[in-house]
Amino acid sequence: MQKVIKSFGTNKVLDSLDLDIQKGEIVSLIGPSGSGKSTLLRCINLLEPIDDGEIWFGGIDISVPGYDPNPVRRRIGMVFQSYNLFPHMSVMENICLAPVRVLGRKANDTKAQALALLEQFGLADKAKSYPDQLSGGQQQRVAIVRALTIEPEVLLLDEITSALDPELVGEVLDAVRNLRNTGMTVVLATHEMS
């Protein structure tokens, strides 16, 4: 990112921001609520247009007006603080939806990948459960697994522990720490210092 500016009305949230993230890095954006962390993540994923500056991804300026955001979004996974799981779908259905519908992958291959990830995140026994049958920490780990099934190059995590009870924060942070071993690039917005 080079000299990125983003405002909402007269409130300048990002002011000439420069940020360089290398492949395989885990970067934490730490600051109080309202400091622009979530806005920055939404700009990286092209969910928010920037007012000025440049956002480069894979050697391409993706911030130029008219750039199609969909190819970028297929390469960047995002996990929101509110989980955003579909309540009428099982854990497995939630996880497999995007890879099958958006990426055109085979359902059986996606289910096998999803089961392996659920196992890795300690949730294999929850594949047939619905979101309202899970704790907040379990729902957040399902959201992380869902983002990982598209095999993103970059994973954006937006305040993923902020809505959790203190006793559940540890299990979600452990899941993030385990991503370190995969070589994935992770950008984590948080006010959590642990």
Residue ranges and their predicted role:
Residues 3-194:
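ABC family nucleotide-binding domain
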